[in-house]
Each structure stands twice: as structure tokens, then as C-alpha cells.
Design a protein with these regions (language model features):
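Acidic, low-complexity cytosolic segments
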Residues: 1-21, 29-124
Length: 124
């Protein structure tokens, strides 16, 4: 429970810093949800898909010879989904509305991912 509460606290801070964020999910690299605030049953589905997208994105970065993956951004007609590796064990997915300041989203998303990685490392 403590891990979930600490992760949710960081995700709440992200929403406060980036008003266009409409929700987020943190999950393990295996796709198991840790915490989330997306509507309906989207958290579990998003967690499972996020793990797969992260794995594919890491592979693409490696194949392209471009170093370690920092983020994956999905740009859609009604907004954005950004995925961040939060250390070796956690994936953070952030959903944002159209018109979101992508520079701010990327900056704050990375900060939140780093905070989640630190939380996870203290749990071991």
C-alpha cells in the first residue's frame, strides 16, 4: 500500500505542474498496475499496453543505435500519451489533452519518472 500511495502522490504533483494532464498510470515492466487515475477500466488495459510499448520502444532505440530510451510520445487527434521508463522496473504513462505544452509535459514527465524510480529503488 505504501508504494501505491507514494506513487499516487508523485502523479498528483505531476497533474498540479501540468494542467493539461488528464490522467496517468504507473505499472511494472510486466504490465501490472501499481497506481493510476484514468477513468473506468482503462488503468489495467493501459498498464498492460504500456509495458509492451516500452519494450518495443527500447528495442527500437537500441536497433537505431540512438542510446538509452528516454520517452515515447504518441500524438493522436485528441491528445497525447507519453511513456517514460522510471528506472528498470516501472513504466509511467501520462495522458494529456490537445494543446498541452509538450516541452513542459516532457520535462515534468521525466522528473516524475525519476521520482518513481527513486521510490522503487528504496522499496528493494
Amino acid at each position: 500500500v505504501e508504494l501505491c500511495e507514494r506513487v499516487l502522490s508523485e502523479m498528483t504533483r505531476l497533474r498540479e505542474r501540468v494542467p493539461e494532464v488528464s490522467g496517468s498510470v504507473a505499472c511494472t515492466v510486466d504490465g501490472l498496475q501499481i497506481a493510476g487515475d484514468l477513468p473506468g477500466d482503462r488503468c489495467d488495459q493501459t498498464a498492460a499496453l504500456s509495458a509492451a510499448v516500452l519494450a518495443l520502444s527500447r528495442r527500437m532505440a537500441d536497433l537505431a543505435g540512438k542510446g538509452v530510451l528516454q520517452e515515447t510520445l504518441v500524438s493522436a487527434s485528441a491528445g497525447f500519451a507519453a511513456l517514460y521508463a522510471a528506472g528498470p522496473t516501472i513504466v509511467l504513462t501520462v495522458v494529456a489533452e490537445p494543446g498541452a505544452n509538450l516541452g513542459l509535459l516532457r520535462l515534468e514527465g521525466r522528473k516524475t519518472a525519476a521520482a518513481l524510480a527513486a521510490i522503487a529503488s528504496r522499496q528493494r
